[in-house]
Every structure is written in structure tokens, then in C-alpha cells.
From Swiss-Prot:
SUPFAM superfamilies: Cytochrome P450 (SSF48264). The keyword ATP-binding does not apply. One of its GO terms (cellular component) is endoplasmic reticulum. The keyword Transmembrane helix applies. It comes from Arabidopsis thaliana. GO terms for biological process: cell wall organization; suberin biosynthetic process; very long-chain fatty acid biosynthetic process. Its EC number is 1.14.-.-. This is Cytochrome P450 86B1. It is a single-pass membrane protein. Involved in very long chain fatty acids (VLCFA) omega-hydroxylation. Required for the synthesis of saturated VLCFA alpha, omega-bifunctional suberin monomers.
Length: 559
């Protein structure tokens, strides 16, 4: 038999004649040859697509795959620290790149960390870059028409009213008194219980409870009692946290997908629906109760919480705000006041343990302030329970610098979103079309050598000091509190809250992270620690405090 003749076949022989062959062996070989040719064709197509996608990476920062766009790279980034991944991409692309999502998806966006671009969209061309429909639709179920999800007149009205209230004497008195109560009569006893039992404690959870109670007092005028000796589970607090966690998933998922999940009531959409019901039930009950109380009191000015203030106002038609609108206002302020400060403090204490020289300088600064009191003396310096007053808190420049440095490296809101209202061009030359989405990466901004220098990854509070006094940076370089017309209204209060809490803890305890505890950010609206912050607390001895007190006489020690 001539075996060579079995392989000497034409294309037509393979695809049209093989079935008529009477030789089973030849038939099998023909089918095998056809399969090999198809496989070779598929491999060639894959190699071509891969080479094309990788070539696109040179110009667009990431490979661009047919149909999928840059989604595979995003999926890879989501497996680890998504914010570090994004920072690396932005660094390679000189601060700006255009993300391409799957075909027919809503994930296309321009991402930037260039301060020139950030100032352009937050200040110079503010009216061209509203939150936009994409952002509002993703968070409408949770935030409704509240200040962080609103644009135009709705946003302006809420901001104007809140701004007046935030600067009132009654509001400052409310915040000062409520914070003192929470820190010295609830927080410290909880921490002391942990010390006495020699058991670790989740400091992030404790701080979230503290700020949650504090902001509920300010926003709703109620005390949920979240921070207590037995660390009770508060349904509203749990529902609120679950809702924010589920809502953020919409930003990394095509709109059609999460809407389909919502229709089927499955996955994160089911969780979001259930959580928002818990939030709404709490808010509705508070609003109903407050209306009854005010009808009996007959005068809204006796209270200074935001809910009562807005209840006393009228809309453009002269009518009272709806319960839904009141709910949206309060939920938005709780989101801002609860998460941002507590998350920032958690990262601050983690960084503090890694940088003991910073902790020492904070202690020296506090001892110096105690020494400067009119009634200072040996009794004062050895007093283990000092209470720092508002004016003394303001003098803590180095502590504020350390907190700002923590916020630079780990901003509470790592990214934020805008939508382009009309065709525009960024200062760096990036072209923007009407309807485009823009993301400014606040986390990445703190890690750019071009912005902060070669030591940008170091925790160095001294970069914020000028002749020993705290000096803030441009809001378009340090964007932890946003910038332009949307600059955070509660910035001063947030610093006061963080400084008061940090001072009370640092002066009394050394905070040591539990060995082996993994610290990494969680994908959420704010940058929670994914596994909390498990720490052991150690009481400071009087002799240790005396050593810091002695160093406080050296005027140049902190600088």
C-alpha cells in the first residue's frame, strides 16, 4: 500500500470527498487533518488579537480586547488592591488614561490624577462636570436626592442651608458636647475594658461606632447607642454598612447586568434592597417621632440637628420638604460623617505603629500643651486622664499634619466621579466628549512623585509644617476633602473630631497591631480596612509620659 498517497490531498479532498472514502483509516486521518487546520486557524486569530491588544497597551495603558475592552485587566486588578493597580497604570500613563469597557457597556471613562485636570473639573469648569446621571442612577436607591448625589438647585439649596448651620454657634456647641461625651464616657471605657482583659479589639469597628453615634446626633438628633460596653448590633448601622458595600459594586459592573440582577432580586442587588429597607425604616421612624416632638414643643429652634433645621424650611413652592427628601438629606450626611473620619483614623493608627518617631512627636506636642496650661505643674503632667479643650486641640499642629499625611496616603474616598456636560479638553490635552464619565483618582494622587516628590510613599508629617505650624496644601493636590464649590463643609469638624479622638487614645495607650493581622483596603464607597484593625492596647506609664514631658522643653524637637 502506498501510504504517501493518503496524505497527498487537496482542500476539496478534505472537506468534500473524505466522507466517500472507503478506507476507515484514511477517513480518520482526514478528519484529524481538518481539526488541526481549524485549531491552527483559531490559534492564529488568537495570536493576532493578543498582539493587537498588547500593542494598544503601549498607547492606552492597558490591553484592549475585542468585545471585552479593558475588562480583563480590571478583573485582574480587583483580585488584589484595586487602588494600587490603578495608581500603577496612571503612573505609567503620566497621570491620565482612558478606560475602555466591554462593547455596549457603561464602563468607558477617563481616569486622571493630574492636579491640573482635577482643578479644571472641580473649580475652573465646575458647571461642565456635575455628578451626572450615571453616578446618580447607581446611588439613587441609597442616597436619593441628598447633597452627595444631587446637582444644580437641589444641591445648592442643601449646601447653603447646611453651610449656615455648620457655622452656627449652636451647631459648634452640639458637636463639641456630643464628641466629649462619646470619647470620654464611652470610647475610653470600652478601650480600658480591652486593656484589663488583655484581649485584642477591632479598633476600626470601635471608631465606626463612635463616629456613627456622633453623626446621628448631629444629623438626626438621636443617639443610636452603637458604642457601648457590649458593642451591640444596631440594625440601622448594619443595614447602612451593607447598603454602601452593595451599592459600590454597580460601578464595576455593566449597568444592564446590575439592573437585570435587580429585576431578578439576586446577588448584591438583593442585599442592597434589603439593606435600604433597614435604612428607610430607621429614618422613617425618626422623622415621625421628631414631627410629634416638634408639634408638642411648638418651636423648632430649640434643637440644632440637621433634621430639625430642614423640617423648619420650605421649598420654592412654600411647602414643607417631603419625608423622603428629609430622609435623603440625613442619610447623605451620615455617610459623610461616619465613614470618612473613622476610616481615616484607622489608617492613621496603623501608620503610627509603623512610624514610632511620629508617635513620639505627637506625645511631645501634647505634653507641651499640658505644660503651657495656667495651672500646670507636677500634678498636671502626671495626670493620666487629661481632657484637651477645643482651643488646645487647635494647637496640635503636628497631630493635624500626621492625620493629613494619613489622608494623603489613604484618603477616605479613594476615587470620585463626574460626567461631562459638553465637549471639553483637559489641560493635559485629553479630549472629552459630552456624556463621557471622568474619574479622579484621589488615592493615586498621593502616590505620584510628580506631585509629592521622591518620598511620596513615605509617611512624613513634616511635609505639612512650615516653621512648626500646619500649612494645608492646594485642594487640587490634596483632594481628601474635595475642592472647589463642593469642598467638604465638614472639613473643620472632621479635623476636630479626628484630633480629639486621636489625642485621647494616643496619650493613654500604645496601639499595637496584632501579629499576622492582614491590613488591606476594601472595595467600597469609602476605604474601609477589609479585615478591620485588630490591635492590642498597652497603658502608658507615668514615667514614660514624664520622659515626653521633659522633651517638650526642646522647642525644636518636633520640627
Amino acid at each position: 500500500m502506498n501510504f504517501n498517497s493518503s496524505y497527498n490531498l487537496t482542500f476539496n479532498d478534505v472537506f468534500f470527498s473524505s466522507s466517500s472514502s472507503s478506507d476507515p483509516l484514511v477517513s480518520r486521518r482526514l478528519f484529524l487533518l481538518r481539526d488541526v487546520q481549524i485549531l491552527e486557524l483559531l490559534i492564529a486569530i488568537f495570536v493576532f488579537v493578543a498582539i493587537h491588544a498588547l500593542r494598544q497597551k503601549k498607547y492606552q495603558g492597558l490591553p484592549v480586547w475585542p468585545f471585552l475592552g479593558m475588562l480583563p485587566s480590571l478583573a485582574f486588578g480587583l483580585r488584589g488592591n484595586i487602588y494600587e493597580w490603578l495608581s500603577d497604570v496612571l503612573c505609567l500613563q503620566n497621570g491620565t488614561f482612558q478606560f475602555r469597557g466591554p462593547w455596549f457597556s457603561s464602563l468607558n471613562s477617563t481616569i486622571t490624577c493630574d492636579p491640573r485636570n482635577v482643578e479644571h473639573l472641580l473649580k475652573n469648569r465646575f458647571s461642565v462636570f456635575p455628578k451626572g446621571s450615571y453616578f446618580r442612577d447607581n446611588l439613587r436607591d441609597l442616597l436619593g436626592d441628598g447633597i452627595f448625589n444631587a446637582d444644580d438647585e437641589t444641591w445648592q439649596r442643601q449646601r447653603k442651608t447646611a453651610s449656615i448651620e455648620f457655622h452656627s454657634a449652636k451647631f459648634r456647641q452640639l458637636t463639641t458636647q456630643s464628641l466629649f461625651e462619646l470619647v470620654h464616657k464611652r470610647l475610653l471605657p470600652v478601650l480600658e475594658t480591652s486593656v484589663k482583659s488583655s484581649s485584642p479589639i477591632d479598633l476600626q469597628d470601635v471608631l465606626l461606632r463612635l463616629t456613627f453615634d456622633n453623626v446621628c446626633m448631629i444629623a438626626f438628633g438621636v443617639d443610636p447607642g452603637c458604642l457601648g460596653p457590649d458593642q451591640p448590633v444596631i440594625p440601622f448601622a448594619k443595614a447602612f454598612e451593607d447598603a454602601t458595600e452593595a451599592a459600590v459594586v454597580r460601578f464595576v459592573m455593566p449597568t444592564c447586568v446590575w439592573k437585570f440582577m435587580r429585576y431578578l432580586d439576586i446577588g448584591t442587588e438583593k442585599k442592597l434592597k434589603e439593606s435600604i429597607k433597614g435604612v428607610d425604616d430607621f429614618a422613617d421612624e425618626v422623622i415621625r417621632t421628631r414631627k410629634k416632638e416638634l408639634s408638642l414643643e411648638g418651636e423648632t429652634t430649640k434643637r440644632s440637628d440637621l433634621l430639625t433645621v430642614f423640617m423648619g424650611l420650605r421649598d420654592e413652592k412654600g411647602e414643607s420638604f417631603s419625608d423622603k427628601f428629609l430622609r435623603d438629606i440625613c442619610v447623605n450626611f451620615i455617610l459623610a460623617g461616619r465613614d470618612t473620619s473613622s476610616v481615616a483614623l484607622s489608617w492613621f493608627f496603623w501608620l503610627l505603629e509603623k512610624n514610632p518617631e511620629v508617635e513620639e512627636k505627637i506625645m511631645v506636642e501634647m505634653c507641651k500643651i499640658l505644660r503651657q496650661r495656667d495651672d500646670h505643674g507636677n500634678a498636671e503632667k502626671s495626670d493620666y486622664e487629661p481632657v484637651f479643650g477645643p482651643e488646645e486641640i487647635k494647637k496640635m499642629d503636628y497631630l493635624q499634619a500626621a492625620l493629613s499625611e494619613a489622608l494623603r496616603l489613604y484618603p477616605s474616598v479613594p476615587v470620585d466621579h463626574k460626567e461631562v456636560q459638553e465637549d471639553d479638553v483637559f489641560p493635559d490635552g485629553t479630549m472629552l466628549k459630552k456624556g463621557d464619565k471622568v474619574i479622579y483618582a484621589i488615592y493615586a494622587m498621593g502616590r505620584m512623585e510628580a506631585i509629592w516628590g521622591k518620598d511620596c510613599l513615605e509617611f512624613r508629617p513634616e511635609r505639612w509644617l512650615r516653621d512648626g505650624r500646619f500649612m494645608s496644601e492646594s485642594a487640587y493636590k490634596f483632594t481628601a476633602f474635595n475642592g472647589g464649590p463642593r469642598l467638604c463643609l465638614g472639613k473643620d469638624f472632621a479635623y476636630y473630631q479626628m484630633k480629639s479622638t486621636a489625642a485621647a487614645i494616643v496619650y493613654r495607650y500604645k496601639v499595637k497591631v496584632v501579629n499576622g493581622h492582614k491590613v488591606e483596603p476594601k472595595l467600597a464607597l469609602t476605604m474601609y480596612m477589609k479585615h478591620g484593625l485588630m490591635v492590642n492596647l498597652i497603658n502608658r506609664s507615668v514615667s514614660e509620659i514624664d520622659q515626653y514631658y521633659a522633651k517638650s522643653f526642646d522647642e525644636g524637637y518636633i520640627n
